[in-house]
Design a protein with these regions (language model features):
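Short, solvent-exposed coil/turn segments at beta-strand boundaries
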Residues: 84-88, 102-106, 149, 182-188
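A short acidic-to-branched-hydrophobic micro-motif
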Residues: 101-127
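Signature of long, low-cysteine stretches enriched in small and polar/charged residues
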Residues: 133-184, 226-227
């Protein structure tokens, strides 16, 4: 297991305990096709917008019934993270570099940030694109790749197969996410927001579709995937 994989598994291992704490306190355009170089990966077909000239993203208004949160990630991460959140997801729990919001045990929003060992911001998003939807039954529905001050971002809407590490209770799940590689004071960081729910939870998916376009990293808005406003 690589260092990066180990870091990514830490939140998963602590998830059960953190959910219990949260419940106690509160009462959490081109086709992209991946083929046969890695036989274990499924064929993925989705709408992708990766034009060279990225229009300046515009900040989205906070949807009705939501409020903007500024996630404090401690010493692990100097990159600010803000987005609108439905109040039903509570105040969240976490530790330096990681924060988790939940609405029950099957509607999760995780925020991650840590120093990245590579050298190029694009390496961060390239790896995320390779591994996030890598198991059978997973697919990208819509995605956007672009530049942000100090780095590169990837926003995505997709479906996670039951065997994906991010899936809910080993069932097919939806994911709405934003990942970026951003330099700060000469150091490269990976920062992400991932919103996950079971694929039959249409209500949560509709909420996530409103939240994702409001995500900002380091104070900068990100362009959402095609189809999300």
């Amino acid at each position: 297991m690589t260092t990066t994989e180990g870091l990514l598994m830490i939140p998963r291992l602590l998830l059960g305990g953190m959910l219990s704490l949260s419940l106690f306190v509160t009462g959490c355009s081109a086709l992209r096709v991946s083929t046969s170089e890695q036989n274990s990966k499924p064929v993925e077909v989705g709408l992708r917008d990766s034009a060279q000239a990225t229009p300046e993203p515009t900040e989205k208004a906070i949807p009705d019934g939501m409020e903007e949160v500024a996630v404090t990630l401690g010493e692990e991460c100097p990159i600010s993270v803000e987005f609108a959140i439905d109040r039903r997801w509570g105040d969240g729990v976490g530790y330096s570099g990681y924060w988790l919001y939940s609405n029950g045990d099957a509607r999760l929003i995780s925020v991650n940030c840590y120093a990245w060992g590579g050298t190029q911001p694009q390496d961060v998003t390239d790896e995320a694109m390779d591994v996030t939807f890598s198991e059978s039954g997973s697919r990208v529905v819509s995605e956007k790749v672009g530049e942000t001050p100090g780095g590169v971002f990837w926003t995505v809407q997709g479906v996670l197969g039951p065997s994906e590490v991010r899936s809910i209770a080993s069932t097919e799940s939806v994911l709405y996410g934003a990942v970026a590689g951003i330099r700060d004071d000469g150091r490269l960081y990976k920062v992400s927001v991932e919103m996950v729910a079971k694929s039959d939870d249409a209500e949560a998916a509709a909420v996530y579709a409103q939240m994702l376009p409001t995500v900002r990293f380091a104070g900068n808005a990100l362009t959402p995937p095609p189809g999300l406003n």
